[in-house]
UniProtKB/Swiss-Prot annotation:
This is Ribosome-inactivating protein PD-L3/PD-L4. Disulfide bonds join C34-C258, C84-C105. 2 forms exist, PD-L3 and PD-L4, that differ in their post-translational modifications. PD-L4 is not glycosylated. InterPro entries: Ribosome-inact_prot_sf, Ribosome_inactivat_1/2, Ribosome_inactivat_prot, Ribosome_inactivat_prot_CS, Ribosome_inactivat_prot_sub1, Ribosome_inactivat_prot_sub2. Pfam families: RIP. It is an enzyme of class 3 (hydrolase).
Amino acid sequence: VNTITFDVGNATINKYATFMESLRNEAKDPTLKCYGIPMLPDSNLTPKYVLVKLQDASSKTITLMLRRNNLYVMGYSDLYNGKCRYHIFNDISSTESTDVENTLCPNSNSREKKAINYNSQYSTLQNKAGVSSRSQVQLGIQILNSDIGKISGVSTFTDKTEAEFLLVAIQMVSEAARFKYIENQVKTNFNRAFNPNPKVLSLEENWGKISLAIHNAKNGALTSPLELKNADDTKWIVLRVDEIKPDMGLLNYVSGTCQTT
């Protein structure tokens, strides 16, 4: 399993762009593309996981473990009292849990568990963060940097603190890798905090559906219109691959052939 490192504490727009490119290249199936957009592999391709190590300005780190075939965050690790401390979402199966534990913290003599006692769904994370929508949780490099420091090496923290970190990290890492539009939102707002707009949320919620629609398109036309949201919350109807292609980073895995260019 390979580790992609991102120095959040010394980040620039270019370094973030390079991080995104590295993550996409590490995760994608080198043989799959639809309309020029790279696709994630099916769940059998090894390595099955990707690690993303985030470092803050004071060199504290948190390592996220992503399932390669869909970029879902399964858990994370930090260094606590000189030991590798691992945290796993409670909706991860026992088989995968063992994988997470052994991948994040390979040394069984120097590790300890601090469970995430809730699941990885956005609705749950929002609830734990005390918001009705993740549009209320600001994203940004400084926020990610300070969130790392609230968890890494800290003995106790609230579910709220942890869920806020996870909402920020999942969107700035996994969602930004899936969607160039989200990566570009981070870059456009690089030196300030920002609230994810309705288009960001709409893309996040429809990634599977969008991937399927692009995969099944005929000569660039979708077989049925996709109804999404614009940044200003108006309805966005997508009829052709070209209309959404600039926003895409990676497609979710869909079996069967598609038009590659």
